């Protein structure tokens, strides 16, 4: 019965109340009263809808609402149990992730590798530890992430040692952590990206927060310096330098900023911001759900092949559905032709048969 306008939008509540503990008693009372009034207004509108129905129909709808309430209770229990199950298995994954970290970064050696390496590695070649460029190649093999990684980013991402994620509760959401070895690009050893969700069970993003990267002088990958020669005859003979923002994977740590509630933005700007936030969330959730749990499969390219195969199968299913639709249309056309013959003869040959229905078939 709802057209979507009756839903309670609390997306601005986090921005409006950054820290509820700092609110005075009066402010808290006003906030509670405001929410209560909003809910009462929604309830009144729903009551109006019910009262506009015929008594018998209204009774049926009331029973449907009771059924929906039972469903919502079960759904809440499902979300609760699912969260507990995810937390349980997340702890079971941790030892496996730790072993992966140690192998990738050369902390431990795999049985049998030492002797094989001594036999196969040329004496003049330096033996590499672990799996070089593991995370860089794992991410590059994913279609979404490969579009974000620029060629100039790759040297810095070779220092990426590990990626972890954690679920957070206050506020709800999740946090990504990128661990880097000492490198010539930035000072940070860990870069983080935190997603605050309005509802953890629904992917409704409130805002995202990234680490401020401490770039070393002249090493910032999110900006480029343009040098322009001065005009002829100019007294200033030095090149003119201009700094511009540029595409980089590391822009991921400077997410789109959601404006304050009292800041007005036009429709086009709002749509652009929404698209940017959706894209940003896609990148974060891809790293969380695909790259971290299946990193070696993305490193080898197996996971990418699996996704390509699934995409082909989906396309074939769509083609089959289209073929079925075409066959149904052909059958309908044949039936119409048969009906026309019964009424007064065959459809005239010529223009009417080239994918078009004849204008009219009159009886003689």
Curated annotation (Swiss-Prot):
Q: Which Pfam families match?
A: NAP (PF00956)
Q: Where is the lipid attached (S-farnesyl cysteine)?
A: 361
GO MF term (any one): histone binding
Q: Mark out the compositionally biased spans (Acidic residues).
A: 259-269, 304-340
Any one cellular component term from GO for this entry? nucleus
The coiled-coil segments of this chain are 32-86
- Keyword Repeat in record: no
**PTM-bearing positions, type Cysteine methyl ester:** 361
InterPro entries according to UniProt: NAP-like_sf, NAP_family
Q: What is this protein called?
A: Nucleosome assembly protein 1;2
Whose protein is this, by species? Answer: Oryza sativa subsp. indica (Rice)
Q: What is the lineage of its organism?
A: Eukaryota, Viridiplantae, Streptophyta, Embryophyta, Tracheophyta
């Amino acid at each position: 019965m709802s057209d979507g306008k009756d839903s309670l939008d609390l997306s601005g509540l986090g921005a409006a109340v950054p820290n509820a503990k700092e609110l005075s008693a009066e402010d808290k009372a006003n906030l509670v009263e405001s929410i209560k009034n909003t809910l009462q207004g929604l309830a009144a509108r729903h009551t109006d809808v019910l009262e506009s129905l015929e008594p018998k129909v209204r009774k049926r709808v009331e029973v449907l609402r009771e059924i929906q309430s039972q469903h919502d209770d079960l759904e809440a229990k499902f979300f609760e149990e699912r969260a507990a199950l995810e937390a349980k298995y997340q702890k079971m994954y941790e030892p496996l992730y730790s072993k992966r970290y140690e192998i990738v970064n050369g902390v431990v050696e795999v049985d049998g590798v030492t002797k094989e390496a001594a036999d196969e590695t040329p004496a003049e070649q330096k033996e590499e530890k672990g799996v070089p460029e593991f995370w860089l190649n794992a991410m590059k093999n994913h279609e979404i992430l490969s579009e974000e990684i620029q060629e100039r980013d790759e040297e810095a991402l070779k220092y990426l040692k590990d990626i972890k994620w954690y679920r957070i509760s206050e506020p709800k959401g999740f946090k990504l952590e990128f661990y880097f070895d000492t490198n010539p690009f930035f000072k940070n050893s860990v870069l983080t990206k935190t997603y605050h969700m309005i509802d953890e069970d629904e992917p409704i993003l409130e805002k995202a927060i990234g680490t401020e990267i401490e770039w070393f002088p002249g090493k910032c990958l999110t900006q480029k310096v343009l040098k322009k020669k001065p005009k002829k005859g100019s007294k200033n003979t030095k090149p003119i330098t201009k700094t511009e923002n540029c595409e980089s994977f590391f822009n991921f740590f400077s997410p789109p900023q959601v404006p304050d509630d009292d800041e007005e933005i036009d429709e086009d700007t709002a749509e652009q911001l929404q698209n940017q936030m959706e894209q940003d969330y896609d990148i974060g959730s891809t790293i969380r759900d695909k790259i971290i749990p299946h990193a070696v499969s993305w490193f080898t390219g197996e996971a990418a092949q699996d996704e390509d195969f699934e995409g082909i199968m989906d396309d074939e299913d769509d083609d089959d559905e289209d073929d079925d639709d075409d066959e149904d249309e052909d059958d309908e056309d044949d039936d119409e032709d048969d009906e026309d013959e019964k009424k007064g003869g065959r459809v005239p040959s010529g223009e009417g048969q080239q994918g078009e229905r004849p204008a009219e078939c009159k009886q003689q």
